[in-house]
Amino acid sequence: EEGWVPGPSLISLQMRVTPKLMRLAWDGFPLHYSEKHGWGYLVPGRQDNLPAASAEPEGPVCPHRAIERLYRQHCLQRGQEQPPEEAGVEDELMVLEGSSMWQKVEELSQLELDMERPGRAEQSQMQDEDGLPELVEESSQPSFHHGNGPYNDVNIPGCWFFKLPHKDGNENNVGSPFAKDFLPRMEDGTLRAAVGRTHGTRALEINKMVSFWRNAHKRVSSQVVVWLKKGELPRAVTRHPAYSEEEDYGAILPQVVTAGTITRRAVEPTWLTASNARADRVGSELKAMVQVPPGYSLVGADVDSQELWIAAVLGEAHFAGMHGCTAFGWMTLQGKKSDGTDLHSKTAATVGISREHAKVFNYGRIYGAGQPFAERLLMQFNHRLTQQQAREKAQQMYAVTKGIRRFHLSEEGEWLVKELELAVDKAEDGTVSAQDVQKIQREAMRKSRRKKKWDVVAHRMWAGGTESEMFNKLESIALSASPQTPVLGCHISRALEPAVAKGEFLTSRVNWVVQSSAVDYLHLMLVSMKWLFEEYDINGRFCISIHDEVRYLVQEQDRYRAALALQITNLLTRCMFAYKLGLQDLPQSVAFFSAVDIDRCLRKEVTMNCATPSNPTGMEKKYGIPRGEALDIYQIIEITKGSLEKK
């Protein structure tokens, strides 16, 4: 081309040559692209595909010796600064909340369903074996490295080819090592520019830094904004000492779909999904840019462990009708993060993973995800785990928490046991194990001419786990003729009623019970707050709810009364839940919010300064917004003297 000069030109992260130019390596192994398998990496040491010494090479020779040296160098460096096994996980990865998690849970639970259906286990095992990329001999795979491979149809002399791990499973190809799912691996040093390549490392850092804004800027710039003239502003704003006529005052109208999911949760792509401010993410202070006009405050709170408590109280009402009567409920009520006795800390200790990871597993499990989900997630969080190790950890976790399946025999099953004189081990509650059910089926098929399978099971249940009672209750609601939420009696979509869906979508229906009850919780809170604001003349209005979090725009002089109203609302809402489930009292540990936030901008914690690359001086220096207040019930009572009356 005319005007061409040596050096990089129009190179973007989307180009296949970029990882090579940066000399990107995965655990010390250089990245390589295969048309068939997508991005992977080369592991040196393969002998069976080396050309004979006498043969003339047709094209360029793979420098497998240099790759070996690179890996040795990486091992030496790793020996000096060994990364922790549980790598820090990026916010985006933890967002398995809401719809994205839900899709994943549904897909993975389908796997579990397939495994539970008769005859499917063997079939799926055969399919798995058929679906393997290539059954490789012991000699043609490295002894010092395991991963997703080797794929020996990629014939690189002296090297095995392994695929990069994909978040949706190893059968999927990775299209770009710069995708946001690889940010945690960049942070923990698994994916980095090879030793001594400072430019590559810096490019990765910049990519990580702009990742949030690259994904969010179009949504942010397309927000609907209404600017207000001075005459349209309340007097409380225009008469406030901080009011400036040179400033523009307006409001964003978030385009919320009010019941956008099957569980009636709101859907909105920007504000309901925005992550918290991070020091290494451009634009991540986005939420804090929503600031109140002079003379107003944002009063709000997060409902503590909302869905965990709802699930726990359902199980307790089902088990003994007393708060804290199940292990799961006791941990929810009495567990403390500082003592390591809360649910997430216990799960983390049981399986040997970090608390943050345990949180994702716990919510996934309560949403109805099965063991395949846990296995895949374990391998996603720690790519150095083998399939077998992940399976063992997942089995251990599910046996301790969810328990094991037990079965109540149908009349046909009881008759077969009697007629065939089979010895089955019945528990106190009359249930039998899966092995006994299989034995009855096997003997019945062997001794009868009937080709159709015998229907020996009346219904299934969970037993022996800390959460068994809770899952039994959730499944009993989900499988009832017309599932409805226990508190406000909201019915499930007719498309998911058992008469239509039969045994399908059980995961969705179990999740619906908990998440739709959480929406009942929100609706009760909104109604209670509206009533208290009107009854006690509190000058404020509802601003936004972000799933288990509510925010109210309140005039400054009423902010503490609004905070007390919020605490009373939480008390009334929890009481309503307990009463509807037949419980006549409420533990104090869940009666009130641990803290009500009074602030001048939207942020996760009132103490966060939200310093980011695009807001380096933070909220206080640049915008004059000091730290807010986070008040517990005792502090609020002290300030308001326990009264909502206007003084």
Curated annotation (Swiss-Prot):
Involved in the replication of mitochondrial DNA. Associates with mitochondrial DNA. GO terms for cellular component: gamma DNA polymerase complex; mitochondrial nucleoid; mitochondrion. Its cofactor is Mg(2+). CDD domains: DNA_pol_gammaA. Its main location: mitochondrion. It is found in: Mitochondrion; Mitochondrion matrix, Mitochondrion nucleoid. Residues 116-147 are annotated as: Disordered. This is DNA polymerase subunit gamma-1. Its EC number is 2.7.7.7. Heterotrimer composed of a catalytic subunit and a homodimer of accessory subunits. Interacts with TTC3. It comes from the Eukaryota. Gene3D superfamilies: 3.30.70.370, 5' to 3' exonuclease, C-terminal subdomain. PROSITE patterns: DNA_POLYMERASE_A. It comes from Gallus gallus. The lineage of its organism: Eukaryota, Metazoa, Chordata, Craniata, Vertebrata. GO terms for biological process: DNA synthesis involved in DNA repair; DNA-templated DNA replication; mismatch repair; mitochondrial DNA replication. Residues 127-137 have a biased composition (Acidic residues). It catalyses: DNA(n) + a 2'-deoxyribonucleoside 5'-triphosphate = DNA(n+1) + diphosphate. GO terms for molecular function: 3'-5' exonuclease activity; chromatin binding; DNA binding; DNA-directed DNA polymerase activity. It is an enzyme of class 2 (transferase).
